[in-house]
Structure formats: structure tokens, C-alpha cells
Amino acid sequence: MDSIIFDLDGTLWDPTETVVGGWNQVISSYTGAAKEVTIDNLQGIMGLPVPEVGRRLFPDADEESRQKIMDECCDMECLVLSQQGGRLYARVEEVLQALSAKYKLFIVSNCQAGYIEAFYEYHQLQKYFTDYENPGRTGLSKGENIRLVMDRNHLMSPVYVGDIEGDRKAAGFAGIPFVYASYGFGEVSSYDYVIDRLDGLLELF
């Protein structure tokens, strides 16, 4: 193994408490098209592609309104997270520091452009990562973005760490082992490794 690629939401942090207010501030200007969201609502869609999030949270909105709501929510999300951050899981920096001494670290997340940068900006963790990617920049699926990062950085034997079924499928698409973060937001049908807290990676690798 030469590298570890991380999902972000439900794997390294939980941003929902920070962003729920911003989401509802945007939604309030679309009376009738969308209902306020809760932390539980947001945790239930974490890790999904942005268009799918819109369909699940705002099923009654027409396509044009839904797109506008999502665009504004995504912009608000990046702004709020860059100013306030999210809730990091226990020992995140300690774990990243230890792992980065042995492996190259990366982030591939199903988020909009600017989201990973907001995570970096507030928490100052970018020094531990070599590269990152998301569909907001590439328009690609998570599995394709994992492959892109692998090719761009000449990775031979990475693993992918994530918390939902989509992460498992993306790792499978990329042909690499999947580490299931069971403390995150979802359940998966299978995995190669499992951790019940982030620092479990130090015992695995």
C-alpha cells in the first residue's frame, strides 16, 4: 500500500450542525418550493452527488427552482464552513499526521467545488494531503475521480476510506480495497476493512 484516499463527510468530519442554518436561510426565500431541512435530513444525504441531494430534499420543487436552491445552498455551505468549520472526528489531525509520514493522503468527495477547500481553510489540514478531487471540478463520478487521482499521482496500491454504500461502489469501480468507516452516516453491503473510529486506521496501517 502506498496511499490512502479519504471521503470527507462522515469520514473525517460531520459538517451538518454548521451548515443546517445556512441551508434554511436559503430555503426560506423559496416559499412553497422547499421545506426546511434538519440535521437528520442532511446526515441522510451526505456523500450523495449534488443533483441527487436536490431530488431527495426538494421533491416538490420544479427542476429550475431545485437547481437554484442547490446552487445557493452549496455557495452558502462553502462560505459558512470556511468561517466556522465542521465537527472533526476525534484525533483527526493526529491520525493524519501519523499516516502522512508513511503514505500519501488524498481526498475524493462527492461535493461541489470549494467544499474541500473550505475544510482545508478553516481547519488548516491541507498540509497532510497531496491532492484532492470532486465532481464540482470534473463532472465525474466518485469512482472516476478516484481513478483520476490515482493516475495523476501515479498511485500503485491505494485504499479508499468512506462511510456509505456509494463509497464502497466507487472503490470497487476504481479496483481498490475499501475501508468502511462504520462511525459515519451510512451502512454498506461489504468491505475489505472496517474501523469504528478514525484512529483505527493507525492499527490497520
Segments (PLM) and residue ranges:
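Short, acidic loop-to-helix structural element flanking the phosphoryl-transfer center
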Residues: L79-I107, E117, G143
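Conserved phosphate-coupling serine/threonine residues in phosphotransfer and NTP-handling enzymes
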Residues: T11, S109-C111
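Structural motif corresponding to alpha-helix initiation and N-cap regions
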Residues: E36-I39, Y89, E93, L140-G143, ...
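N-terminal helical cap/lid subdomain that shapes the substrate entry/recognition surface
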Residues: D2-A90
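Asp-based, Mg2+/Mn2+-dependent phosphohydrolase catalytic module
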Residues: M1-D2, E64, A113, E117-F205
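Helix C-cap/helix->beta junction micro-motif
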Residues: Y30, K102-Y103, A174
